[in-house]
Regions:
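A short beta-strand motif characteristic of beta-propeller blades
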Residues: 30-35, 72-77, 114-119, 158-163, ...
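WD40/WD-repeat beta-propeller blade N-cap
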Residues: 34-41, 77-84, 119-126, 164-170, ...
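Terminal intrinsically disordered, low-complexity extensions flanking WD-repeat/beta-propeller proteins
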Residues: 1-25, 294-298, 303-315, 319-374
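Loop/turn segments within WD40 beta-propeller blades
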Residues: 44-51, 70, 88-93, 130-137, ...
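Short loop/turn segments that connect beta-strands within beta-propeller blades
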Residues: 68-71, 110-113, 154-157, 203-207, ...
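Structural hallmark of WD40 beta-propellers
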Residues: 50-55, 75, 93-97, 106, ...
Length: 374
């Protein structure tokens, strides 16, 4: 009788052991050309100064610039001892900012990689950061688990505004791109929260009380991510297992709903191909037809929750709790090939195994006869 020599096995249920074994087996796959990092990856942003590179934030408290083609770490940003949740670059691209579990926003000089100013003011985890230029001044905007949004002067570190109104923690911040194009004197900031509300405010604000304006309530629970497409429509990803497209011209009314089997962590729109790409807690990256809302293909490779996605040219770059960065091509030929390969694999798995017409004893006798013939 086999007995486990692993002490932790005695404290796990059969289901949890099976899940651990499943993940261990799946972790060996090379789908998406995985780049393995030391710890869980919680955020990703583009590197505007280096094509083919991205910045990622890790649970170990480090941020790094990774070259996608080689997997090389081109720059490492250290200092925090708590997980980093979010990233942003200053408007001039010279400073990297990271929201941290230590309730502050860290910053580094991109070229020297040396830590710079820390921005303080939150009483709980910082969950999201973004940057903008407002009336000629560069500002850092942070959202925290304390439900506050703080606008800082990047140069001085001064807290310019503190916006309140959400009832629970901020999950994401997104600047309306149309507000940047139309009026250089200010911007419009959208915020998503665990209270299921999406709110928006002008920066500089007319009031520090976000609750004075009507929120958008289109989800049943937490909204994790916001994404503006080229038409200015707002895409939302939620813990209610849906992604929704809110039409700007129809007062932000949903005109498309994408149903998922689990929490949806991120969404992006690939304009050139007409695809919507989503990241889900069920470990999958999905590609949807934007016009019809139909699921076209599912990229499988991650073996833990997918925490974020980023479009780099015609490639989807995904990150995960499994500590890998993976890449998926959306070029028409590559996407069609991936879809056909996935369908062929599914057909093979569904093919019933033919049962032998022989009894176990007859099969044994046949095997012995074949050995004798040799």
């Amino acid at each position: 009788m086999n007995r486990s020599s692993h002490r932790e096995d005695f404290f796990q249920t059969t289901a949890s052991l099976e899940e651990s074994n499943r993940k261990a087996a799946k972790s060996r796959n090379q789908n998406g050309n995985p780049i393995k990092l030391p710890s869980k990856i919680l955020a990703i942003i583009a590197d505007p100064l280096h094509d083919g590179s991205v910045y990622v934030a890790e649970s170990a408290g480090t941020a790094r610039r990774v070259v996608l083609e080689t997997g090389e770490t081109a720059a490492l940003f250290k200092g925090p001892t708590a997980p980093l949740t979010s990233l942003s670059l200053s408007p001039d691209g010279k400073l990297l900012f990271a929201g941290c579990w230590d309730k502050t926003v860290w910053s580094w000089d991109v070229h020297s990689k040396q830590p710079k100013r820390k921005y303080e003011g939150h009483s709980d985890f910082v969950k999201s950061v973004t940057c903008a230029r407002v009336k000629g001044q560069d500002v850092l905007i942070s959202g925290g688990a304390d439900a506050k949004i703080i606008v800082f002067s990047i140069d001085s570190g001064e807290r310019l505004y503190v916006l309140k109104g959400h009832l629970r923690g901020i999950q994401d911040l997104r600047i309306d791109p149309f507000s940047v194009e139309q009026d250089s004197s200010g911007i419009v900031l959208f915020s998503a929260s665990s209270d299921r509300e999406i709110r928006h405010s002008s920066i500089p604000p007319d009031t520090n009380d976000l609750s004075s304006s009507n929120p958008l309530i289109v989800h049943e629970t937490s909204v994790y991510r916001l994404f503006f497409d080229a038409d200015g429509d707002l895409w939302t990803a939620s813990a209610d297992k849906t992604v929704k497209c809110l039409a700007r011209e129809n007062d932000w009314t949903p005109n498309l709903v994408l149903e998922h089997p689990d929490f949806v962590r991120d969404v992006a729109v690939y304009e050139q191909g007409g695809w919507v790409v989503t990241a889900c807690r069920d470990e999958e990256v999905r590609v949807w037809n934007r016009a019809t809302g139909e699921l076209f293909h599912t990229f499988s490779g991650h073996f833990e929750e997918v925490t974020g996605i980023l479009l780099v040219g015609s490639t989807v770059v995904s990150i995960s709790i499994d500590a890998t960065i993976r890449q998926w091509s959306l070029r028409p030929a590559d996407l069609q090939r991936a879809r056909e390969e996935a369908q062929n694999k599914k057909n093979e798995e569904e093919q019933p195994k033919q049962e032998s017409m022989l009894t176990e004893e007859e099969e044994r006798e046949l095997a012995e006869l074949m050995e004798d013939d040799e």
